[in-house]
A protein has these predicted regions:
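Non-catalytic regulatory/linker segments of enzymes
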Residues: 1-256
Length: 256
């Protein structure tokens, strides 16, 4: 099929020859994604996807994969695909420096966002399992205070997430100045939901963020050929490596 496309599109054939002779990195990526050659026929296909388009595609991927490892592999493959798209456009001088940097930053932001969504989804499922295995309520009459406590407990069970987590982009990622080898400098902040126990919220935030980091860097099966895994660096946080990986909003406010 691609030979027909190259025969019918001299521009695509010329672009392919240019890429293969100028970039070993792109050549390695193309070997595992030959359908990407079709992008060479249209300049529009060599433009970085918008943040909205990436979000929609990633949301669809997550909904189709119940297993977090499988879902994250799909997201990481998408990231590699989009890096290839940007690299091809860059090699052919079809993109400005700003387009390249912003495109790469957007892909990494969405990848981190996907890992956060998966980690939170796991936490919700764990909470639902705990609720299912919890002892059933007694049918004995309860006082007003017990009723109120029961309602509060039921509300907490309906929403297993005790805190809201945000990832703050720093460095090159924060300034949308990414290169092809850039890592992602970030800080993690959380805000307990109203009525949540602060210690429990902090413990949950720690679990979610540690799982996020694991999903991004752990080996996937089958391995993604020529993947350069995203390196997430949270060392710019208060107290560096010795400090808490994720802090509450109030903690950041007090620190600064």
């Amino acid at each position: 099929w691609y030979l027909r496309m190259l025969r019918d599109s001299p521009a695509a054939a010329e672009r392919l020859c240019h890429i293969l002779s100028s970039s070993r990195y792109i050549t390695d990526l193309l070997e595992d994604a030959p359908t990407s050659i079709t992008w060479l026929d249209k300049v529009a296909d060599l433009q970085p996807l918008s943040a909205g388009a990436l979000k929609a595609e990633i949301t669809s991927l997550l909904s189709r994969h119940e297993d977090s490892a499988d879902a994250m592999r799909a997201v990481r493959y998408l990231r590699r695909r989009e890096i290839l798209r940007i690299a091809m456009g860059d090699a052919l001088n079809l993109l400005s420096v700003q387009q390249v940097c912003t495109g790469l930053a957007t892909v990494d932001e969405r990848t981190i966002g996907a890992a956060l969504a998966l980690a939170e989804r796991e936490e919700v499922k764990a909470g639902e399992r705990d609720e299912e295995t919890a002892p059933q309520k007694s049918d004995a009459p309860q006082s007003d205070s017990q009723d109120a406590a029961g309602e509060s407990s039921e509300d907490e069970q309906q929403n297993p997430l005790l805190t809201e987590i945000t990832v703050i982009a720093m460095g090159r990622l924060g300034g949308a100045e990414n290169g092809f080898g850039s890592d992602a400098d970030v800080m993690f902040v959380h805000r307990p939901v109203e009525g949540a126990d602060e210690k429990e919220a902090q413990a949950q935030a720690n679990r979610i963020v540690n799982r996020l980091m694991q999903l991004i860097k752990q080996p996937v099966r089958p391995a993604i050929r020529a993947e350069r895994p995203l390196e997430v660096d949270a060392d710019l946080r208060p107290e560096g490596k010795q400090g808490a990986l994720v802090r509450s909003l109030d903690s950041y406010r007090a620190y600064y």
